[in-house]
């Protein structure tokens, strides 16, 4: 399995039914995504509400995703926490279930320094011996992996890439200049994919692709042969992408995924549903795209 995918991976939502996960809907959604040409599944991350899943629930979603993917696309599980040893223990359980890669967020709350980040990620990679995707999302963790630290981590045989959700293209450009050519660089921001691709990025770990996987994943493939057409495709989807910013992720995308039938619209506290008027506007934009209207 080549875990260094090119194109669109999906940060998959987790459907709830009361106090439990609706595993049938989860499986249906995974098949929908794979059948609509996404290149990777990323589960139990921010968009999957991984921070409010129990360990048993996380392991069950991993088990299902590995079975459903069946080698068609890589499955990457968010296993990172701010507890190094707990992350190792959970990651080893994920490895035993056959996950292709783990995604490790920077430690949060017990904020460390760059030397601490280097030790944290290296210790986990050494212990788990599974491909590691770093996750840089300072807006949520108040911790940035500096480019020099990423470059040092890139020398580790199991650390193969990073999901960067800063939205800062200059950060990515500098990073590109200090890491090996085969180090994977993924955007965590749907609204920044074109400049990210122009700067040499390998793909995106997308939120909007939960609802429009075929349309959004086609942008990367089109970009390889016709940049102007890719820009047109992107601009047509941009109003819907921007509409997801009306509330905190994953609140808006879960409303949209519920509308297309792969969730029940439920969130786990402290997340609460969107305002009705915002949901209505989001669905109207989606329906216009579904009907082939040009929103650009």
Curated annotation (Swiss-Prot):
Transmembrane segments: none
Binding site for pyruvate: 47, 205
InterPro entries, per the entry: Aldolase_TIM, DapA, DapA-like, Schiff_base-form_aldolases_AS, Schiff_base-form_aldolases_CS
Any single GO CC term annotated in Swiss-Prot or TrEMBL for this entry: cytosol
Catalytic residues, chain numbering: 135, 163
Record-marked site positions (Part of a proton relay during catalysis): 46, 109
Pathway entry: Amino-acid biosynthesis; L-lysine biosynthesis via DAP pathway; (S)-tetrahydrodipicolinate from L-aspartate: step 3/4
Membership in a protein family: Belongs to the DapA family.
UniProt protein name: 4-hydroxy-tetrahydrodipicolinate synthase
Native source species: Macrococcus caseolyticus (strain JCSC5402) (Macrococcoides caseolyticum)
């Amino acid at each position: 399995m080549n875990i260094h995918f090119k194109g669109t991976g999906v940060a998959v939502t987790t459907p709830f039914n009361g106090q439990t996960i609706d595993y049938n809907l989860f499986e249906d959604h995974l098949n929908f995504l794979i059948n609509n040409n996404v290149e990777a599944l990323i589960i139990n991350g921010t968009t999957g509400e991984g921070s409010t899943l129990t360990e048993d629930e996380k392991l069950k979603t991993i088990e299902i995703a590995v079975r459903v993917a069946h080698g068609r696309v890589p499955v990457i599980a968010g296993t990172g926490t701010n507890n190094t040893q707990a992350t190792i223990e959970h990651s080893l359980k994920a490895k035993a279930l056959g996950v292709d890669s783990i995604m490790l967020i920077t430690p949060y709350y017990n904020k460390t320094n760059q030397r601490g980040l280097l030790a944290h990620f290296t210790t986990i990679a050494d212990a788990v011996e599974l491909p590691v995707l770093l996750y840089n999302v300072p807006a949520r963790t108040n911790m940035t992996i500096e480019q020099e630290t990423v470059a040092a981590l890139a020398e580790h045989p199991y650390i193969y890439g990073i999901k960067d959700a800063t939205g800062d293209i200059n950060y990515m450009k500098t990073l590109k200049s200090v890491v090996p050519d085969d180090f994977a660089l993924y955007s965590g921001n749907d609204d920044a994919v074109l400049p990210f691709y122009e700067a040499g990025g390998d793909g995106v770990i997308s939120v909007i692709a939960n609802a429009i996987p075929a349309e959004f994943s086609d942008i990367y493939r089109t970009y390889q042969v016709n940049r102007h057409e890719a820009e047109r495709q992107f601009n047509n989807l941009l109003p819907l992408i921007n509409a997801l910013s009306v509330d905190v992720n994953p609140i808006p995308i879960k409303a949209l995924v519920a509308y297309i039938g792969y969730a029940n619209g439920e969130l786990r506290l402290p997340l609460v549903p969107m305002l009705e008027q915002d949901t209505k506007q989001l669905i109207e934009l989606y329906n216009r795209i579904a009907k082939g209207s040009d929103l650009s």
